[in-house]
Structures are given as C-alpha cells and as structure tokens.
Amino acid sequence: MSALKNKIDFALVFTATNANPNGDPLDGNRPRTDFRGIGEVTDVCLKRKIRNRLLDLGESIFVQSDDRRADDYRSLKDRADGCKELAECAKKKEKNRAEYAKIACKTWYDVRAFGQVFAFKEKKGSDDENSDSVSIGIRGPVTIQTAVSCDTVNITSTQITKSVNLETGKDPDQKAPDTMGMKHRVDFGLYTTFGSVNVQQAEKTGFSEEDAEKLKQAMLTIFVNDETSARPSGSMEVVKLVWWKHNCPT
C-alpha cells in the first residue's frame, strides 16, 4: 500500500426527510438540535455509520456495534485478546507500546483511521487499583466534525400506540400504559459536516492512499444498510461529497 502524501479535506452534504437522523437519549430520543433549533448529527454517530459501511465492504473493524458485529466477540477486550499477535505482545514482561500500537493499526482499519484508546486490566475480574493494566492511546489521522443543518429544523412529534400489551395484566382486555409512546422526526433538514485526513498522523498509523479511497467510498454510501423505523429507506440521502486533495502534506 502506498503512503498518504497529501493532506485531504472533505465536506459531506446530506438530507433527512421525515426521519430522525440522530436521537438524543437525554431528550426522549428527539432529533438533536442546539439552542437555536439548528439540527445536529454528532461525529460519533457519523463514525459509527462509516464503521458499519466499512464492515459491509469487508474491512476489519475493532469497534463493532453489538447488532452489527461480524465475529463472536462481545467486548473490545475480547476482540483485542482474540488477535494472536496483540495478545502475545500484551503478555510480554517488558511491554512495547509502539509495537502494540503498530499491530493494532495493522489489524483494524478504524484504529489506524480514527485512533483508539486501549485501556484494559490484565488480571481478569480484578478491581484492585494496583492491578496491572495496559493503557495505550493511538491518535488517528481522520477527524470529522459534528454535522449541522443549514437552517433550523422543524420537529414533528407523533403519539403512537402498540396493538398488544408487553405483559399480561390482571385484565387482559385493558390497555397497559406501555402501549403508548412518542415518535419524533425532522420534516426536512440539509446537513453538512467537514473533516480531514492528517498526513503526519497517517504516517504513524499506516493509513494509506488506498485507505483514504475506501473512506471516500464509505462516505458516499454512508446510509446504505442503515435503515430503521426512525430512518426509513430513502429518508437519508447523500447530496454531495466534496473531496479536496492538497498538493502538499499540510
């Protein structure tokens, strides 16, 4: 793979139509907005979608969501321990942090792209503060900003009901309170996010030109296989991806 030689800046423009692009769990899962009513989609949400797309495209991903995982590991520690090279490096008496980071970056695309903090206790089940542990931070070259809407967004909230009770009560014919709920959506929002790929950090993690091209393809199809009841098929759409490749490293 060829090393990344030129800095890359990018802008992703997308729309949300009758959808909840990113619910806020602290606000009843209403679409995120700032105090002015400008819609927001967090960088964490965007990176989650990018990871999912890269996983669909066959890339090895370290931070996999539980409902989209491609292996049998149920935690990050299990996944790290499942990498033979990484496990052997962690067992060494004299730990080489640079070697550990190099293996992790080589193994997982998202680690060499977004970075990762490996902070695991070595003695399983030990809560002792003095127990041996490993804490290695890796800075990734790819950064993405929170997406914001170009204008204020109108949020529509709809009362919904379930057709059946969750549990059988004393009176099976009586509707339980849990059959009532709320569903929120953005009528329409045009969102923009900006990001970049840093050459200096790419050299440290091994992020290559080929990796940059894969990132570009993942962003162009970021909403593929991302459909849910909150984001029905066709409700989230990429309008444009502007990809600036500089003629210098900075």
Give the residues covered by each predicted segment:
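RNA-binding basic/glycine-rich loop and surface signature characteristic of RAMP-family CRISPR effectors
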Residues: 1-250
